[in-house]
């Protein structure tokens, strides 16, 4: 039978029944009886869900489903509580342990009695619910009648279409060209451009496409993008603007009134040309405040506002230069292009509609009202269906019934209802985060796994299965993806889809938000997101069975809060305290037996309590950007750990090894054989070689970052890396710049390696690096290579990013014809002996971004063949000699012709470890600086 929300509960009971060594004495019969009862009820669920989706018998079916769901939660709580009470005695030892076990036997008898009694109560409740369902017409559906094969099951999840840029969702070239002209041309007076239209019309996508354009970036001195949404804090918005336009940090961080935040921002922008985007504005008062902070400085500054509210646009139009642009629904021709691109995306159809489906496709398209979000979403649903008239007619019929209600959100809900249940839970999880929240895919995988949403599959890790889940949500256009080189992936959902998520999450009590110190949670929910003060949270949760707690925007957090959570929420699986003002993690957190994910990112926690060793179910530990310097030895007991995040920096510069730090680990890391991610840890001080040898046991590792590597570790480290068959990301950082790390001993490198960062002196490039077929990002720092490396690296077929920082001491680099055919970004930094960079015609054909300098010996641009880079969009030149920079200026510079084809050219001069003065090509400020250097 197709899965339902009861399927995971039935599986859990089945596992409980068959697990060896688990004591069900006295209750096995009751557990099996309960499982059988759920299997009888499950066929009725499909009928009830179908009625809810089609709005037939809606209220009764929805109420019936809610009652079943509540009983399912009771069962889940019951099982977890029982497991905790039964297993708790397993780890006791010694005389006191024996005494405790004797006491525990008495408690175990009571636990069995309690569970038997609770099961009987649940069964009686389920009987009554089932009978009521039959009474109002629910019938068990036939096995397989509602089976919906998902795309993840049918196709390779690593489809090239999954890595499309967001702006490919809509074909907006004409509109973006018009908007760019409004930004760059026209009056010098400050102008406000309001993009108005209903949700899903493409306002944000249009604004983002133009905002990210290199020509626009080059035209303005300062840039800021602020997502406002319905919930906002004016002070926070002003701080975000200030931070993005690079106002000095001291001013931003001080406690200020609104007026005190406005004044320095206004002064800072008075002499600068700026572009600021306010996305998704709902209230008029935003503009009434912001117009005072953004001066009308006659420098050609521009402000873009996207809104669904006509009043917001009207209020912001204060002079003749201001523009209100109303976005219109798409023409049928434009809509057809997008529809086919999304619905027929695989290799068989290549974006073309089969003739037998053309009329039905047009009929479906006409129902989408010309809204690109609706078109993309419905096409995403169809992309997972068989390409048959029967399937197409079903979708058309559902669309027709929803459109009779003239509610776009109802139409978009079809894409939610089309999801199989395991994906519904994953999709609803975006509801625990704030609107427009961006989350990295690895974090999302860890949360889904911790919640038990990801089902194990043979020959695949849980993370790989979770990646398939996310990829299908992306393919269905339910999740928007922002990716850099296909490695670092940020996910978010459209604001309209977010509203749909909150609606369904609320109906099924999936998650709940507690905002502004609310004192009541209302109906019980499994997950709690706290926004702001926490003083009332413990009163609110009471003896709640909450499974996950997230904090957002919390300014005060007492130790007693975490202690209270540990005492009241015994079934907690996820505790995310990221960015909270937490100085100390209390030992009571060790009592959270079921905890699978603990995030302390960007807190001020200095040490972890030894009691953390009691968290035997912990899978994810995040202490990145904290003050933690060492993980306690008890960590090595946590054999279920899959992810350890522990990275930070002393400063923001990449120019010295001392800028990086990780956390120390005690001996025994080899016991953590389930580790998938380990970043960044330091080798055992004094036992570095032993640490390297222990790494051989981490056969499942996917991402590894090690600091304070020593030269002596080379052979042992190489042997360990060779055994890491699944490794995709590797970073090694040497303990200092004087030692030399020899990695040439590696003969069989991990075939799937796609990210390689080596922060170490090597002198000779290992010959295995050029063999890394899947490598996308290569970062070589402090290598001090004797031989020029480009001849070896040029053939890497999938390399997209290359940075050479203090990598080569020679005088010349030569990019040969046909080399680096896919490279998008190149950074050549601090190559102090470099005098010449040769670039053959046909080399670097796709290069879009180039950053180079300082090269103190390169005095004239004649030595750098920038003119060969025809695809270049962005050029940043760092701390180059005065003569070199003067030669490139448009007013009399003899080598301006070399860079005149590049849309964005900037010159950067470092004035602090992590700060640069940035000047545009030909600007008066740059020329004054160059003149001062010559005096």
Label each residue range with its predicted role.
Residues 45, 52, 59, 163, ...:
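Leucine-rich repeat
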Residues 32, 38, 96-198, 205-208, ...:
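Regulatory and partner-binding modules of innate immune sensors/adaptors
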């Amino acid at each position: 039978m197709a899965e339902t929300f009861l399927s995971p509960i039935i599986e859990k009971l089945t596992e409980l029944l068959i697990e060896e060594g688990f004591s069900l004495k006295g209750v096995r019969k009751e557990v099996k009886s309960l499982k059988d009862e759920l299997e009888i009820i499950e066929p009725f669920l499909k009928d009830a869900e179908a009625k809810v989706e089609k709005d037939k018998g809606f209220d009764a079916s929805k109420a019936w489903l809610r009652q079943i769901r509540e009983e399912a939660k009771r069962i889940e709580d019951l099982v977890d509580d029982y497991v905790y009470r039964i297993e708790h005695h397993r780890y006791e030892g010694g005389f006191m342990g024996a005494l405790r076990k004797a006491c525990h036997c008495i408690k175990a008898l009571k636990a069995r009695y309690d569970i038997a009694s609770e099961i009987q109560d649940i069964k009686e409740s389920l009987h009554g619910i089932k009978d009521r369902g039959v009474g109002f017409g629910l019938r068990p559906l036939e096995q397989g009648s509602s089976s919906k094969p998902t795309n993840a099951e049918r196709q390779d999840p690593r489809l090239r279409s999954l890595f499309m840029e967001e702006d490919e969702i809509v074909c907006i070239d004409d509109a973006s060209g018009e908007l760019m002209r409004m930004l760059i041309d026209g009056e010098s007076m400050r102008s406000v451009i309001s993009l108005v239209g209903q949700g899903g019309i493409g306002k944000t996508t249009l604004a983002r496409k133009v905002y990210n354009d290199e020509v626009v970036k080059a035209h303005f001195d300062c840039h800021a993008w602020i997502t406002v949404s319905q919930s906002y804090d004016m002070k926070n918005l002003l701080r975000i603007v200030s931070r993005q336009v690079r106002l000095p940090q001291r001013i931003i961080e001080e406690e200020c009134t609104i007026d005190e935040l406005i004044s320095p921002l206004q002064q800072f922008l008075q002499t600068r040309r700026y572009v600021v985007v306010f996305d998704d504005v709902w209230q008029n008062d935003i503009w009434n405040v912001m117009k005072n902070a953004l001066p009308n400085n006659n420098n050609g500054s521009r402000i873009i506002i996207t809104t669904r509210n006509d009043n917001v646009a009207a209020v912001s139009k204060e002079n003749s230069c201001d523009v209100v642009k109303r976005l219109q629904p798409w023409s049928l021709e434009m809509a057809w292009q997008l529809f086919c691109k999304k619905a027929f995306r695989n290799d068989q159809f290549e974006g073309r509609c089969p003739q037998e489906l053309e009329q039905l496709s047009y009929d479906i398209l006409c129902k989408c009202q010309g809204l690109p979000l609706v078109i993309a979403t419905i096409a995403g649903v169809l992309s997972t269906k068989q390409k048959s008239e029967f399937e197409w007619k079903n979708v058309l019929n559902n669309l027709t019934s929803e459109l009779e209600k003239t509610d776009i959100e109802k139409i978009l809900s079809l894409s939610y209802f089309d999801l199989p249940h395991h994906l519904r839970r994953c999709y609803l999880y975006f509801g625990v985060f704030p609107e427009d929240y961006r989350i990295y895919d690895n974090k999302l995988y860890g949360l889904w796994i911790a919640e038990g949403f990801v089902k194990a599959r043979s020959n695949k890790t849980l993370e790989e299965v979770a990646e398939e889940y996310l990829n299908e949500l992306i393919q269905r256009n339910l999740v928007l993806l922002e990716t850099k080189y296909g490695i670092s992936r940020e996910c978010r959902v459209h604001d309209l889809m977010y509203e749909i998520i909150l609606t369904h999450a609320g109906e099924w009590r999936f998650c709940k938000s507690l905002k502004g110190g609310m004192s009541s949670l209302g109906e019980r929910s499994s997950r709690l997101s706290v926004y702001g003060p926490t003083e009332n949270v413990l009163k609110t949760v009471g003896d709640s069975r909450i499974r996950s707690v997230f904090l957002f925007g919390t300014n005060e957090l007492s130790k007693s809060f975490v202690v209270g959570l540990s005492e009241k929420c015994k079934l907690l699986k996820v505790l995310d305290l990221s960015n909270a003002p937490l100085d100390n993690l209390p030992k009571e957190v060790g009592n959270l037996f079921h905890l699978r994910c603990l995030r302390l990112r960007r807190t001020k926690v200095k040490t972890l309590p030894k009691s953390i060793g009691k968290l035997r179910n912990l899978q994810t530990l995040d202490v990145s950007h904290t003050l933690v310097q060492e993980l306690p030895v008890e960590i090595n007991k946590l054999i279920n750990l899959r992810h350890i995040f522990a990275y930070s920096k002393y400063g923001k510069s990449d120019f010295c090894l001392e800028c990086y730090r990780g956390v120390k680990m005690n001996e025994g890391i080899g016991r953590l054989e389930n580790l998938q991610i380990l970043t960044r840890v330091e080798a055992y001080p004094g036992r570095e070689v032993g640490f390297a040898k222990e790494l051989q046991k981490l056969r499942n590792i996917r991402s590894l970052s090690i600091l304070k590597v020593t030269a002596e570790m080379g052979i042992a480290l190489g042997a360990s890396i060779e055994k890491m068959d699944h490794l995709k990301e590797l970073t090694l950082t040497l303990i200092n710049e004087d030692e030399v790390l020899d990695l040439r001993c590696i003969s069989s490198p991990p075939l799937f390696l796609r990210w390689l960062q080596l922060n170490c002196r090597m002198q000779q490039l290992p010959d295995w690096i050029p063999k890394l077929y899947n490598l996308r990002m290569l970062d070589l720092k402090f290598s001090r290579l004797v031989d020029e490396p480009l001849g070896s690296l040029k053939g890497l077929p999938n390399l997209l990013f290359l940075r050479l920082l203090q990598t080569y001491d020679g005088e010349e680099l030569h990019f040969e014809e046909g080399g680096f055919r896919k490279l998008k970004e190149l950074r050549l930094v601090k190559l102090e002996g470099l005098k010449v960079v040769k670039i053959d015609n046909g080399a670097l054909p796709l290069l879009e971004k180039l950053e180079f300098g300082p090269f103190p010996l390169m005095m004239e641009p004649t030595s750098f063949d920038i003119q060969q880079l025809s695809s270049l969009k962005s050029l940043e030149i760092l701390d180059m000699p005065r003569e070199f920079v003067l030669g490139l200026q448009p007013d009399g510079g003899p080598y301006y012709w070399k860079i005149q084809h590049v849309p964005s050219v900037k010159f950067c001069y470092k004035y602090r470890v992590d700060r640069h003065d940035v000047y545009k090509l030909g600007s008066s400020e740059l020329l004054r600086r160059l003149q001062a250097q010559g005096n």
